[in-house]
Regions:
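Alpha-helical protein-protein interaction modules
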Residues: 6-15, 23-247
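Aromatic-rich carbohydrate-recognition surfaces in CAZymes
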Residues: 20
Length: 247
């Protein structure tokens, strides 16, 4: 499987396999080996940053993303993911500035509009959040994650009928994509329905989802819930989304 790849690429693929096995210790070891093999490779710092953020080590993750950005300053996805990490760390104003920096490079980069919308949603500037999510949907061709976040913004702004319509549509076309299950949970959190949110998170768990979504501030209202803590325990991430030590 790995014969045609250089050693750094092999380590990255192994780390991704460990992610979907939820083998966090092995994933970290693979990332560190990849960095040792090629410390100037932006992608390995980028991916390692996400591992750190999922582990609740926000300050270290942001530092790795800044390193990745310094190595590849024209990368749209690295720039956008730095904005995402800042939002996860509750550094919303910094996140907004970073998303705007990304959009200066490419005003039509859907992910940057989505990240900007997430920061606005947490700042409770909901009209702006709704506008950014709509733009992300327009540019991406109706991405489920973007639609779920639009529904979340509708729900938290009091436009619950519009949120319910979107979540019903998402449920109707939901298939085997565990990311859609977890995104539907986000909408129910916006609607204040923790029971439905947990039902959909457990569906995502059964489908072996990527749990990085759980670090996002939309899930803050669930962190003290025993059912959510049990989910994290099963994934092996009881400390997921821990507060940034810099705060």
């Amino acid at each position: 499987m790995f014969l045609s790849l250089d050693r750094t690429g092999q380590q990255l693929i192994r780390s991704v396999l460990d992610l979907y096995d939820w083998d966090w210790g092995s994933a970290e070891a693979e990332y560190k080996r990849a960095i040792a093999l090629n410390p100037g490779y932006a992608t390995v710092h980028h991916w390692y940053a996400w591992h750190l953020i999922v582990m609740g080590r926000n300050d270290e993750g942001i530092a790795e993303l800044r390193k990745a950005e310094s190595l590849d300053p024209l990368s749209l996805i690295i720039s956008a993911d730095l904005a995402d990490a800042l939002c996860i760390a509750h550094l919303y104003d910094e996140s907004v500035r970073q998303s705007r920096k990304t959009l200066e490079m490419d005003p039509n980069f859907a992910i940057a509009h989505y990240q900007l919308g997430q920061a606005f949603a947490q700042k409770r500037t909901l009209d702006e959040a709704i506008g950014e999510f709509k733009r992300a949907i327009e540019l991406s061709g109706n991405d489920d994650t973007f639609e779920a976040n639009l529904a979340y913004a509708y729900a938290t702004s009091g436009r619950k009928d519009e949120a319910i319509k979107i979540v019903n549509d998402l449920e109707d076309r939901q298939s085997q994509h565990s990311s859609t299950d977890a995104s539907i949970a986000v909408v129910y959190l916006g609607l204040g329905d923790k029971d439905q949110a947990m039902i959909w998170l457990n569906k995502a768990y059964q489908a072996r989802f990527n749990p990085s979504i759980l670090v996002r501030p939309a899930f803050d209202s669930l962190r003290s819930d025993a059912r959510f803590q049990d989910l994290l325990r099963r994934i092996g991430l009881l400390q997921i989304g821990a507060p940034n030590p810099l705060h």
